[in-house]
């Protein structure tokens, strides 16, 4: 009997080219050397979440994204496979694999130079064909930045529902400042994750406690809004959960949201049915997600520290405290 796929992660694939601790950005014609070298890393939401899941012990994870038929596309496939993930890319001959350049001057925030390339062109049909493998959970990231997927979200999510697959969708601010692609699909999404700024852009409400209610009124089911070091606010049914963050020394926040999604998915995959969880099981999944996000930011790189031992250490040292400071309340939703 063929083993059921635990998780399908779809969204963006890209290659990050990173130089940190630069003394300055040179004027035109200048040259500087990167004191810590220049690194090349796999990136993109689908890649990050799938690698995180493999590092947390999931053995049956597939990642889907769009790449070019080029050297960097091959690098992405090899890196996924080495990490324990089955790559299922859509490969284009005429469009290059996407690249993102990250430059950090000592004492300043990161500067990014990105391109819109193959990563934006993932086909809905490619995803729907992979959903025929009936994954237990389907993570769909980069919504707002996938040209064709954004236009057909309800169709893709209904295909997942037809396969009895639980869906978790993660969003980014859209290339065009219009959220219709998401709001029209909210009722098809089992769990939606977004950060506080994204929630504000959709609802016009800065308070996460009010924003989750606004999202529910737009049709969302289970909602998770994260606020970095301020923790998260979630709404499941009529119950709102507010949970503080774990306390860690932040080194690099890259991939923190992806890590949270991976931790949440990993916890739900321990259940018989990932979509029929009790409130306590959901709260623990949020706790594990926050621990994964906290572990992520303690080192450079989007997936470097998202490992079982680091998350277990955080849960053992701070988990009870975070839970004790969390609140659950019944919310009146008109």
Task: For every predicted segment, state its role.
Residues 79-95:
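A glycine-rich helix N-cap at a beta->alpha junction
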Residues 91-92, 102-147:
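Conserved phosphate-binding/catalytic loop of the ribokinase/pfkB sugar-kinase fold
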Residues 1-8, 17, 159, 208-334:
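Conserved phosphate-binding/catalytic region of the ribokinase-like
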Residues 1-66, 71-82, 323-334:
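Glycine-rich phosphate/adenosyl-contacting loop at the front of the ribokinase-like
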Residues 2, 131-133, 186:
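A short, aliphatic-rich alpha-helical micro-motif
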Residues 137-213, 231:
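Conserved beta-alpha-beta core of the PfkB/ribokinase-like small-molecule kinase fold
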Residues 58, 162-166, 219-222:
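A short helix->loop->beta-strand "cap" motif at the edges of active sites that frequently abuts
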């Amino acid at each position: 009997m063929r083993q059921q796929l635990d998780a399908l992660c779809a969204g963006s694939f890209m290659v990050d080219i990173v130089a940190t601790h630069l003394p300055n950005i040179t004027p035109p014609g200048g040259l500087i050397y990167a004191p810590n070298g220049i690194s090349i890393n796999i990136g993109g939401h689908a890649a990050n979440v799938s690698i995180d899941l493999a590092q947390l012990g999931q053995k049956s994870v597939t990642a889907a994204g769009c790449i070019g038929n080029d050297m960097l596309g091959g690098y992405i496939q090899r890196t996924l496979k080495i990490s324990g993930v089955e790559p299922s890319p859509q490969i284009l001959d005429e469009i290059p694999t996407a690249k993102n350049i990250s430059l950090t001057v000592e004492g300043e925030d990161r500067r990014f130079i990105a391109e819109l390339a193959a990563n934006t062109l993932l086909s809905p049909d490619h995803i729907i064909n992979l959903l025929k493998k009936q994954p237990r959970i389907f993570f769909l990231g980069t919504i707002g930045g996938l040209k064709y997927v954004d236009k057909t979200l309800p169709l893709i999510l209904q295909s997942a529902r037809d396969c009895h697959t639980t869906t978790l969708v993660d969003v980014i601010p859209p290339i065009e400042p219009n959220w219709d692609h998401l709001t029209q699909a909210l009722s098809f999404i089992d769990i939606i994750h977004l950060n506080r700024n994204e929630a504000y852009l959709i609802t016009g409400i800065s308070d996460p406690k009010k924003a989750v209610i606004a999202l529910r009124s737009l049709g969302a089911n289970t909602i998770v809004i994260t606020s970095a070091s301020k923790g998260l606010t979630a709404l499941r049914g009529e119950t709102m959960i507010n949970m503080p963050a774990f306390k860690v020394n932040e080194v690099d926040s890259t991939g923190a949201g992806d890590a949270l999604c991976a931790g949440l998915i990993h916890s739900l995959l321990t259940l018989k049915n990932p979509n029929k969880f009790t409130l306590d099981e959901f709260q623990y999944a949020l706790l594990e997600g926050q621990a994964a996000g906290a572990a992520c930011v303690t080192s450079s790189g989007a997936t470097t520290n998202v490992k079982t031992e680091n998350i277990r250490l955080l849960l053992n040292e701070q988990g009870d405290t975070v839970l004790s400071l969390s609140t659950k309340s019944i919310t009146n939703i008109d």
